[in-house]
């Protein structure tokens, strides 16, 4: 009896400690806000079918080029890149932008909604000019991503899911971004910043505030995902064709 009670108490303590890091898809979507606070759309004054949106002439030309990458009669295959184009033009995806994508690609609007609500990379709420996405999944967490998140919140004066008053920065937590070997890391717009310390992320934010784009990649000095001390194998060009093959073959 005592053992069971102690075990339950211990489990409850672990749950409380790790709860923020054990997140399913629905919880993540609610927390992240910008990607999709809900999997359904509800009209607001800022986001409704009458919200003005149309592609620029330049982007209409880009859409024509995108569609040509797919077989004739399969415009629907271009939903993802055309949604991305709409988001890059507008900064986020109001329902009117999704409707325009459906119109241009000649597909039912629901086919576009399905995609836009599935992928968290599509922002269905306005975000700042610099969209800071902090990975807090296990590898980054073990490399102290909490210190990175705390440094950002302190530097910008906002919490997860919020945007700075000047609309310059939006901060969210995200699941694994696939750069675990360079943890901890964040994604800002399209760029990865890796091997971070709290000081690194503060410097990156200062550069962005100054209108500069910091160099992406590791901040530790290593190249890409090579070992911190440099290569230990593949240190010279590979041998040419036929190397090691018997002369009689």
UniProtKB/Swiss-Prot annotation:
Q: Known EC number(s)?
A: 7.1.1.2
Transit peptide endpoints, chain numbering: 1-32
What CDD domains does the record point to?
A: TRX_Fd_NuoE
Its annotated compartments are: Mitochondrion inner membrane
Q: Per its UniProt record, what PROSITE patterns does this chain match?
A: COMPLEX1_24K
Q: What class of enzyme is it?
A: translocase
Q: Which InterPro entries match?
A: NuoE-like, NuoE_dom, NuoE_N, Thioredoxin-like_sf
Chain segments carrying region Disordered: 213-249
| Topology in the lipid bilayer | Peripheral membrane protein
Q: Which family does it belong to?
A: Belongs to the complex I 24 kDa subunit family.
Its function, per the record, reads: Core subunit of the mitochondrial membrane respiratory chain NADH dehydrogenase (Complex I) which catalyzes electron transfer from NADH through the respiratory chain, using ubiquinone as an electron acceptor. Parts of the peripheral arm of the enzyme, where the electrons from NADH are accepted by flavin mononucleotide (FMN) and then passed along a chain of iron-sulfur clusters by electron tunnelling to the final acceptor ubiquinone. Contains one iron-sulfur cluster.
UniProt name for this protein: NADH dehydrogenase [ubiquinone] flavoprotein 2, mitochondrial
What broad taxonomic lineage does this protein's source fall under?
Answer: Eukaryota, Metazoa, Chordata, Craniata, Vertebrata
């Amino acid at each position: 009896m005592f053992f069971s009670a102690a075990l339950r108490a211990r489990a409850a303590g672990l749950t409380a400690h790790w709860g923020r890091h054990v997140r399913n898809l629905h919880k993540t979507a609610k927390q992240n806000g910008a990607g999709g606070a809900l999997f359904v759309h509800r009209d607001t004054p800022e986001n409704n079918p009458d919200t003005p949106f149309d592609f620029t002439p330049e982007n209409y030309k880009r859409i024509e080029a995108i569609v040509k990458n797919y077989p004739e009669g399969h415009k629907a295959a271009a939903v993802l890149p055309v949604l991305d184009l709409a988001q890059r033009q507008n900064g986020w995806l109001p329902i009117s932008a999704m409707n325009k994508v459906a119109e241009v690609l000649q597909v039912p609007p629901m086919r576009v909604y399905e995609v836009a609500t599935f992928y968290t990379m599509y922002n269905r709420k306005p975000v700042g000019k610099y969209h800071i996405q902090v990975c807090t999944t296990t590898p980054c967490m073990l490399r102290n991503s909490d210190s990175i998140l705390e440094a950002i919140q302190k530097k910008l004066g906002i919490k997860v899911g919020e945007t700075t008053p000047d609309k310059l920065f939006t901060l969210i937590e995200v699941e694994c971004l696939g750069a675990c070997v360079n943890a901890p890391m964040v994604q800002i717009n399209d760029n990865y910043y890796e091997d971070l310390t709290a000081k690194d992320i503060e410097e990156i934010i200062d550069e962005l505030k100054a209108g500069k784009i910091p160099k992406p990649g590791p901040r530790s000095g290593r190249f890409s995902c090579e070992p911190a001390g440099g290569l230990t194998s593949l240190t010279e060009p590979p041998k040419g064709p036929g190397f090691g093959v018997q002369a009689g073959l």
